[in-house]
Amino acid sequence: MIVINIKENEPIDKALKRFKKKFEKTGVLKALRARSYYEKKSVRLRKEVIRASYRLKLQEAASND
């Protein structure tokens, strides 16, 4: 359960923004979307390999700059 303490005289926009950040960090929505349909283990592993290679490319590009 996510708890946000609203400070005195704090605009609701800022409190809502903090709530959204905390909610995004927990990864609840991401997990919910991932479980919305069944995904075979081989497909999941293939996606992980693709993501890992993409991150590696980004790291190499950043180190070359």
Swiss-Prot record:
GO molecular function, one term: structural constituent of ribosome
Cystines in this chain: none
Gene Ontology terms: cellular component: ribonucleoprotein complex; ribosome
Gene Ontology biological process: translation
Domain of life: Bacteria
TM annotation in the entry: none
Record key words, sorted: Ribonucleoprotein, Ribosomal protein
Family membership noted in the UniProt record: Belongs to the bacterial ribosomal protein bS21 family.
Stated name of the protein: Small ribosomal subunit protein bS21
